[in-house]
Amino acid sequence: NVVSMIFQEPMTDLNPVFRIGDQGNEVIERHDGAGKSKEDIKARTIELLEMVGIANSEGVYKMFPHELSGGMRQRVMIAMALACNPRIIIADEPTTALDVTIQAQVLDLLRNLKDKINSSIMFITHDLGVIAEMADYVVVMYAGRIIEKGTAEEIFAHPAHPYNIGLMASKPVVGKQVDKLYSIPGKVPNPINMPNYCYFKDRCEMCVEKCDGAYPCEVSLSPTHKVSCYRYYDKKEEN
């Protein structure tokens, strides 16, 4: 009950043949149902639906998933994730299937709930805007490995790894006109035949001679900012 998860597409995670209330009740029965009557479990499910901003909670309790909008279905999934008061909520692209307006509402909801239940959220996303808005600490991955991590300010204002630098250069900036957005050259390595050197080397425009060696170890740029790149090994040797 310590870890809970919110998935990307609620329509594929909710069972289409069971009512919302039945599915919410089952979560509570399996994980937090000891000593609770059916009435108590129903009341808790309705309470959770209200907590995530569903006004007609008793009506939604009786509905099937197909009767709800995408945003409402995702709110139901969030309610089910909160059923056991988890310490960590893993949110895997929870707003990808939603339009921009509903996405903003769901992000606000998650932020408020995090503080309300004193929980932490591990947010998995490709959306840099969502990261900038939601994250306190950011871990950047490339081809399955962590290449840089730091506070949101460090990652966005002082990117260190060439891949992260490329990401920041490729995003549009308000008030700045460009003929063409930057695009990182090359392709991601084949996961079946990964190289034994830095996975980004073949796409990197900042390679140094050392990059031909083994996969680089992590280097600390600050107490919170760390990067796996040979370009910063001089700093590692100084430390």
Residue spans for each PLM region:
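Conserved ABC ATPase signature
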Residues: 63-68, 72
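P-loop NTP-binding/switch modules centered on Walker-like glycine-rich loops
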Residues: 90-94, 98-179
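Conserved ABC ATPase "signature" region
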Residues: 39-59, 168-169
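ABC-type ATPase nucleotide-binding domains, specifically the catalytic core motifs of the NBD
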Residues: 22-40, 50, 150
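A short, proline-enriched helix->beta-strand linker immediately N-terminal to the Walker B motif
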Residues: 83-87
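ABC nucleotide-binding domain signature
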Residues: 1-8, 122, 197
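Short catalytic/signature loops enriched in Gly
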Residues: 55-58, 149-239
